[in-house]
């Protein structure tokens, strides 16, 4: 493993872990105890554009279905797990260029390491992937489908100190604002918006400042909130349907393959899924062409279907009227709230209802992750 960063390091992120992400981490034998500020959450409050709140509870006593873990700590813990497993991890070494990438081998030039030869390269190097750029395969002017702002807040004395909030305000749709609880009365607070002609950076900066004056948000956060450090902003790529997935002996994963959920901007589970899919493709095939085909087919049968569903739902949620109606239906019965919140947190694949091959008897009734810890 080679990374230009030296861990621990901050990472612009909402820090939310869905059920899918939690199950994958458990499958990788990752321990939540290695993340000091890990916080499981049970209550989810979603506010409609008309101001009405939908309160939903994730199952208790059945494992973890949602958690918040600061990426500075989570990523460092994953790096330490790799080191403990005997995996060489080279920190603080930047990628320079691809020297060779053909049917026989792939070699890359790494700062401080020199020329490195490998059977395959899995490029988890972000939306602006330097590896993809080195191969002249980047899209000029591409800025992502979403843009997000985030800041940590302390001294939160409102209900947001314990409960997870999502606000679908009219001017954010199909985006939203969020408050994800952390230990010691801290939260990860932010918002995300889809990029279009009306959402310039100046508009988003103005919106960011305005959020702190909105009464419903102030009511959730309380009246003693203290912003920590500065806010950070980042682009979110969500176009796995037409992103470059692989070339030669190089496979792109995570943000480098634009794998985030286009409806929510969530990407931790997708990064883990694509990384595992790339590793499986390499392990179970003999030739580069077979590896690329296997990897691409895996993405087509899993993430691509979910991407199309999220894209469709995102268009629906662009309308305040439609969003109000959807949330009114969700709030109509205990049954709809119970199953909607599990679907919302990726207890099942986003498009599972329309992909029968992924149906199973325990649909939306499976236990969460880490049952012995919850």
Please describe what each predicted stretch is.
Residues 280-374:
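C-terminal helical "tail/cap" subdomain of flavin- and related membrane-associated enzymes
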Residues 37, 115, 199-281, 286-289:
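FAD/FMN-dependent oxidoreductases across multiple families
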Residues 49-52, 99-106, 246-248:
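A short, glycine/Asx- and small/polar-enriched loop/turn
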Residues 81-221, 242:
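Predominantly flavin-linked oxidoreductase catalytic cores and closely associated redox partners
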Residues 1-2, 123, 253:
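Generic enzyme active-site microenvironment
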Residues 1-13:
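Glycine-rich FAD pyrophosphate-binding loop
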Residues 22-76:
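A conserved beta-strand/loop capping segment in the N-terminal third of enzymes
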Residues 16, 60-81, 196-203:
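Short beta-strand to alpha-helix junction loop
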């Amino acid at each position: 493993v080679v990374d230009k960063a030296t861990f621990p390091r901050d990472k612009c992120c909402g820090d939310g872990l869905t059920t899918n992400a939690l199950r994958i981490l458990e499958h990788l034998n990752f321990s939540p105890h290695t993340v000091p500020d890990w916080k499981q959450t049970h209550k989810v409050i979603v506010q409609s554009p008309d101001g009405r709140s939908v309160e939903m509870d994730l199952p208790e006593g059945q494992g973890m279905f949602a958690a918040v873990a600061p990426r500075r700590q989570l990523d460092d813990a994953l790096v330490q797990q790799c080191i403990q497993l005997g995996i060489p991890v080279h920190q603080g070494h930047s990628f320079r260029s691809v020297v060779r990438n053909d049917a026989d081998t792939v070699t890359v030039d790494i700062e401080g390491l020199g020329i490195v030869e490998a059977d395959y390269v899995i490029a988890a190097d972000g939306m602006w992937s330097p590896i993809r750029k080195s191969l002249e395969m980047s899209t000029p002017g591409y800025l992502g489908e979403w843009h997000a702002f985030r800041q940590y807040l302390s001294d939160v004395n409102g209900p947001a100190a314990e409960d997870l909030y999502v606000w679908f305000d009219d001017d954010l749709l199909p985006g939203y604002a969020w408050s994800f609880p952390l230990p010691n009365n801290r939260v990860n607070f932010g918002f995300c918006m889809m990029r279009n002609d009306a959402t310039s950076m100046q508009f988003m900066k103005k919106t960011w400042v305005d959020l702190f004056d909105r009464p419903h948000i102030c009511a959730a956060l309380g009246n003693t909130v203290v912003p920590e450090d500065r806010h950070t902003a980042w682009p979110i790529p969500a176009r796995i349907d037409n992103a470059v997935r692989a070339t030669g002996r190089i496979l792109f994963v995570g943000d480098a393959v634009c794998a985030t959920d286009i409806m929510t901007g969530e990407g931790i589970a997708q990064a883990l899924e694509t990384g595992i899919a790339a590793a499986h493709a390499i392990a179970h095939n003999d030739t580069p062409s077979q590896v690329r085909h296997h990897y691409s087919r895996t993405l087509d049968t899993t993430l691509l279907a979910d991407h199309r569903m999220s894209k469709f739902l995102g268009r629906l949620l662009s309308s305040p009227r439609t969003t109000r109606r959807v949330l009114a239906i969700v709030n109509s019965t205990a049954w709809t709230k119970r199953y909607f919140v599990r679907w919302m947190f990726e207890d099942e694949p986003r498009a599972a209802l329309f992909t029968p091959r992924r149906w199973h008897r325990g649909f939306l009734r499976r236990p969460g992750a880490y049952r012995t810890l919850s």
